[in-house]
Amino acid sequence: MNGFSKLMLGTVQFGMRYGVANTTGKPSFEAAKSILKAAYDGGVTALDTAPEYGDSEELIGRALSELGLSERFKIVTKIPKLPAGCDAEKFIAESLEASLRRLRINRADAALLHAEVDFPYLDVLKSMVGRGLIEVAGVSLNTASHRDDGDVADCLQVPASLLDRRFDRCFGKGRHVFVRGAYMQGMLLMPEGKIFIPEVVERRRKLEKLGIPMAELALRFLFSKPGPKSILTGVETVDQLKENVRIAALPPLDENDLRKVEETAFPELPEMCVSPSFWSQYKKLHNIQ
């Protein structure tokens, strides 16, 4: 797998309102188009999308076509959770073909099983390489219970951040890793009073003592991970995109700062604290509205 930029643009925001820190909502078509142009100009030529991200795929296809950049980006899409009892090969092939039509491309650079429970169908997805629909196949992981499943995948998407270390063992194994959740859906960057998880507040206070802006620290830490990787960030504005590009041009953390960051990860926080998928459970458990 070659050609994936170190910074990757997440596009769920193009299709729906997303993220606990999102204050601007879904961008307009013209705004999203401007973000894509700014991404290309800034060397961010990898995109992450999925059929379940509203009209994200359609928007990308139209915008890149109008910009004349359809062949300039590496695009990763996903296969929705397979319905029980379906013909897996037929479902996966039809899903990919529909995504390619929406994206206005002939082949996706990578496709991931969106639901980790569908991992047994990875070989079926891999067979789509032979059909010319995708270049490589992988899986998007979400929970620690499935982290060992990815060892046979050509590529992985995993959540990771300054506080989420569940998938550290997935790095440095030669395959490409797409990393999402760098800012924990924006929670790491929110005003302290708006963070509803005290454990996150406590850890962030320790990280702030390093004297490095939190957004910068979050990305530079992930760029310090071993092996080939792309750090996925979603934005709602061109200015946010340009700031991420600026940070991506900075060097990884030095050994001293990296050691201090590592120290904040122990003891490891419960999955309920670091994974957005479990935040509704956290709120219910702690009676948070």
Can you name each region flagged by the protein language model?
Residues 1-71:
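N-terminal binding-site loop/beta-alpha segment at the start of enzyme catalytic domains
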Residues 3, 61-74, 100-104, 129, ...:
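Acidic (Asp/Glu)-rich catalytic clusters
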Residues 4-8, 45-46, 52, 72-78, ...:
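Structural preference for beta-strand elements that scaffold enzyme active sites
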Residues 9, 39, 47, 60, ...:
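Conserved, mostly hydrophobic/aromatic
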Residues 24-38, 85-104, 141-148, 218:
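Short, acidic/polar
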Residues 113-266, 281-289:
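Beta/alpha (TIM)-barrel catalytic core signal, keyed to glycine-rich beta->alpha loops juxtaposed to Asp/Glu
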